[in-house]
Amino acid sequence: MPTREELLEEERKLRRLRIIVDMTRNMILQQPINYEEAYELVKFVKREALQLFPGKEETFDIIYRPRFNRLLNEKFGYRLATNLHE
């Protein structure tokens, strides 16, 4: 069973990721950026997520990829590439 400190650290990392995702979403929606710039922002979010939660690429693809796909499709008419490469 995780310790209280481990649970607090997990919550801190989740909160940080939530902030990063929300800020990125707002930037894509509200800033005059093109698809390529938005795509780079999504790649940044994925890198940050994997830095916070190593080995959780599949989780990112299940939770956040569909959200960003909808967002990019709504704004630009494009979806994310199959793989978000560096």
Which residues fall in each region the model found?
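N-terminal acidic leader/helix
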Residues: 2-35
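Short, solvent-exposed positions on alpha-helices
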Residues: 36-40
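Helix-rich interaction surfaces within compact, conserved domain-sized segments
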Residues: 44, 49-86
